[in-house]
Amino acid sequence: MKKNFRVKREKDFKAIFKEGTSFANRKFVVYQLENQKNHFRVGLSVSKKLGNAVTRNQIKRRIRHIIQNAKGSLVEDVDFVVIARKGVETLGYAEMEKNLLHVLKLSKIYREGNGSEKETKVD
């Protein structure tokens, strides 16, 4: 994911937390705030309580990959921060994807069928 799709500055994180709305499930919390750009931006937060640096970086890579795959179905004019909760470090990729997309659907950031997802025909 390119750097212009990321929330990096502390003031941006603080604004999203202070002025934005939050949605959560057991594994993730998502804060969102509308922006004036023509693309979404995402910030990631993984606590040191979830494991060592290797584990935390693996979680962040997986979250980035899930968001990259869902990019075409994400609302464009929003900044959001994904916070990983305790227990996410034990999830496999498929379960993590299911949980993250669930909370993104709750927040109306993710809309199914909007993007470049390929449909497979079953005969």
From Swiss-Prot:
Database matches in InterPro entries: Ribosomal_Su5_D2-typ_SF (IPR020568), Ribsml_uS5_D2-typ_fold_subgr (IPR014721), RNase_P (IPR000100), RNase_P_CS (IPR020539)
Pfam families attached to this UniProt entry: Ribonuclease_P
Known catalytic reactions: Endonucleolytic cleavage of RNA, removing 5'-extranucleotides from tRNA precursor
A GO molecular-function annotation: 3'-tRNA processing endoribonuclease activity
GO biological process: tRNA 3'-end processing; tRNA 5'-leader removal
GO cellular component, one term: ribonuclease P complex
Annotated EC: 3.1.26.5
SUPFAM superfamilies: Ribosomal protein S5 domain 2-like
Enzyme category, top tier: hydrolase
Presence of the UniProt keyword Thylakoid in the record: no
Alphabetized UniProt keyword annotations: Endonuclease, Hydrolase, Nuclease, RNA-binding, tRNA processing
Gene3D superfamilies: 3.30.230.10
Family recorded in the similarity comment: Belongs to the RnpA family.
Function noted in UniProt: RNaseP catalyzes the removal of the 5'-leader sequence from pre-tRNA to produce the mature 5'-terminus. It can also cleave other RNA substrates such as 4.5S RNA. The protein component plays an auxiliary but essential role in vivo by binding to the 5'-leader sequence and broadening the substrate specificity of the ribozyme.
Subunit structure: Consists of a catalytic RNA component (M1 or rnpB) and a protein subunit.
PANTHER family on file: RIBONUCLEASE P PROTEIN COMPONENT
NCBIfam families named among the record's database cross-references: rnpA (TIGR00188)
Protein name, per record: Ribonuclease P protein component
Source species of the chain: Streptococcus pneumoniae (strain ATCC BAA-255 / R6)
Gene: rnpA
